[in-house]
Structures are given as structure tokens and as C-alpha cells.
Amino acid sequence: MIELDINASDKSLSHRAVIFSLLAKKPCFVRNFLMGGDCLSSLEIAQNLGARVENIAKNSFKITPPWALKEPRKILNCNNSGTSMRLYSGLLSAQKGLFVLSGDNSLNSRPMKRIIEPLKAFGTKILGREDNHFAPLVILGSPLKACDYESPIASAQVKSAFILSALQAQGTSTYRESELSRNHTEIMLKSLGANIKDQDGVLKISPLEKPLEAFDFKIANDPSSAFFFALACAILPKSRLLLKNVLLNPTRIEAFEVLKKMGTHIECVIKSKDLEIIGDIYIEHALLKAITIDQNIASLIDEIPALGIAMLFAKGKSVVKNAKDLRSKESDRIKALISNLKALGIECEEFEDGFYIEGLEDISQLKQRFSQIKPPIIKSFNDHRIAMSFAILTLMLPLEIDNLECANISFPQFKRLLNLFKKGSLHGN
């Protein structure tokens, strides 16, 4: 059995630890921070807003926030990070100053009206390109008034932007969403003194009466990153894997539950229940069966491309529905997944809010089909999750991926671990 501590700190928690420190007003410590491109964007923006960031150990920082955020002289560059842009928009909505947030071509093509509308409900002065649909975003910080908002989509980023504004508004605000999205923001902020109550799925957020408490967070391993190696174990015969020190928040492990329903043997062992649930995940290969995914999409949206690879080895027709938001990620992930699978000779098709994949009998059938075609170059579309999903197939096929380097956005150790996985030399790493 391979034991693997992926050393890939959770992306969601890393972003939030940096951004929330700016509301603490006292030094905060973030340990085991994810040194990927997206999270580094959040860290750099914090510095541009006046925070002092000191490197105190490997992947660990002391963040000393300013008493009042500084109006930056330059654009706040979010690069490829939608989390940075959306959460900072909420944070800055009530701060004194003019703030401009922009990103790369991919981020500036992603939908931003989904956060502009709830922020405007507070009275936020915010503008976006093309009638508020896209970044760059311009925010003129101003006093906010509490509001009630029902989000048409389940999105942790939208919810988090709303909460950060609500904490700075006059009066108690309420937020509803169609299904539960990731709840790290609520968990972390409540632990730091914020008054946030969940009443039958409706969040009630009261304004901060004092700065957030200073904190010392150690970030656990990211289940979304760990899932790529769970996928590898699920599709490689006779494989057994132990993923160590993984965040086991129930809103983050739905993809593991889906893989379990498909037939993979999976067991989670809880090791600690402090701020978040952390533990180990044991995975053992078994024959996979087809599945339909049409619920709890918000809790597994990031893992659907990888699940698409699992469906390739699940006998029968697998279907994904109600996942239109996949088209608004770093790439159109529905199109990216299906176009690459078709290039491999797989029977599959996309539709507006999902896709279907006709699974194969076994690996030998995939290798046989592969031998009958000219090996395609897999197009990552510069999307880290598409690149890593198809990279798992290189464990059994001589595939070339046009840009595996984009994995560094969320999982800088991925290529090294994948190579060690190929060599079967991961024990103890």
C-alpha cells in the first residue's frame, strides 16, 4: 500500500486565512500555506493593502494587518484567482478608498455579475466591464446597509463575498442559497468572533462589534488535490492508497462519496476535530460502475473533471446534470473534458448543463482503442483541473499534455508526486 501525505495545503483555507487576517488588526499566523499561484495572489494583494508579511518558516507567514487598509496606487492583480477577486470585492466594499481588481484573460472572462448584484444590495459602489458582467472591477468603498439576499446559485465565493460585506454593514443581513456550498468562511469567521448564525439554511450575519480575533492556523491537505490520487487508485488494478492529513469537511468530500458509490472501497478515519475535521482516507481499487450525478453539485464542482476520468472506466453510461457552472470556470470544463475524451476515441457527448460518458470494460479496451488512433495532444486549456485529470491517464497511456505546468496554480507538488506514483516510490513521502 502506498502512503501519501500530498503536502498540498488546502486552497480554500489558505485564501481565507490571508483575507480574514485583514479584519483582525493584530498579527496572525498562517502555517502550511499553499504556495500555489492563486493563493500567492491573495497574499500579494494583502501586502498591497498595507499588510506586513513575514516568512517565519517553510510555507508559513506572520501577517500583520494595518489598522486601516491602504488605498493602493496600482491595480490589485488577482491573476487567475477567482477566489481572490470575489472575496476581496466583499472585503473592500466598505473600506475607505478606490480599488481596482483585475486578472488574466481567463479570469477577466469569468462571470462577476453573480457577486456584483448581492454587493449592490448593500449599497456597494461597484462597477464591472460589459454591464457588470466581467472584470476588471472598480470599487469605491462606502458605508453599507444590511440587506436580505437569496442567491440563484450555490457558490461559496458568492456567499463569502456577501458575508464579508455584511460584517461591515449597519444591521443584520440574511443570505439564502439553493443548496449548501462550502462553509469554511462561516466556520473560520465564527471561530474568530463573528456573529453568524445558521437558522434552517438561512445565514444571519451581524456586523462586527470589534476586530476579528488574531489567530494561528495550520492548514490541512486539500481534498480536491488529494482526489487526483484517489482517482489513480480507483482506476489502477490492485492499487491501495492511504491519503494522510486531509481536510474532511463534509462540504468538501462529496466526490469521494461519489467514487465510493461507483464501487471504490473508501474509508475516512478522523484524526482531529478542532476548527475543521482532519483525517486519513484509505482507498482500494475495485471495479467501477456507471453513475448519474445531478445533486450536491456545489460540493463536488471542482472534482467533476476527475470524476469524468473515473467514468471512463465505469461500465455503462454515466451522466452529469445540473452542472452548468462548469462552463464558467478557468475554462469551459464540460467542453474541455468531452473534446479531449472524443480525441481518445471515447463515446461521450456534452449538453448545456452536463455530459454523458459511455464507460469501457477495462483498461485493456482503452489501450486497444488508443493503439488504433494517432495519439492526440491533450489540451489543458490552461486549466489546472483539466490538466491534472488527464495527467492521471498518463499512468497507463503515453499521453502528452500541452501545459501541465498550469497545475502549479493549485498543486505545485503534483508533477513530482505523479512521477513518484509512476515509479511506485511514494511510501514515506
UniProtKB/Swiss-Prot annotation:
Phosphoenolpyruvate binds at K11, G82, R110, Q157, R333, R385. Its EC number is 2.5.1.19. NCBIfam families: aroA (TIGR01356). Keywords: Amino-acid biosynthesis, Aromatic amino acid biosynthesis, Cytoplasm, Transferase. It catalyses: 3-phosphoshikimate + phosphoenolpyruvate = 5-O-(1-carboxyvinyl)-3-phosphoshikimate + phosphate. Its main location: cytoplasm. The lineage of its organism: Bacteria, Pseudomonadati, Campylobacterota, Epsilonproteobacteria, Campylobacterales. Belongs to the EPSP synthase family. 3-phosphoshikimate binds at K11, S12, R16, S155, Q157, D302, K329. GO terms for molecular function: 3-phosphoshikimate 1-carboxyvinyltransferase activity. One of its GO terms (biological process) is amino acid biosynthetic process. It comes from Helicobacter acinonychis (strain Sheeba). One of its GO terms (cellular component) is cytoplasm. This is 3-phosphoshikimate 1-carboxyvinyltransferase. Monomer. It comes from the Bacteria. SUPFAM superfamilies: EPT/RTPC-like (SSF55205). It is found in: Cytoplasm. Catalyzes the transfer of the enolpyruvyl moiety of phosphoenolpyruvate (PEP) to the 5-hydroxyl of shikimate-3-phosphate (S3P) to produce enolpyruvyl shikimate-3-phosphate and inorganic phosphate. CDD domains: EPSP_synthase (cd01556). Pathway: Metabolic intermediate biosynthesis; chorismate biosynthesis; chorismate from D-erythrose 4-phosphate and phosphoenolpyruvate: step 6/7. The gene is aroA. The active site is at D302 (proton acceptor).
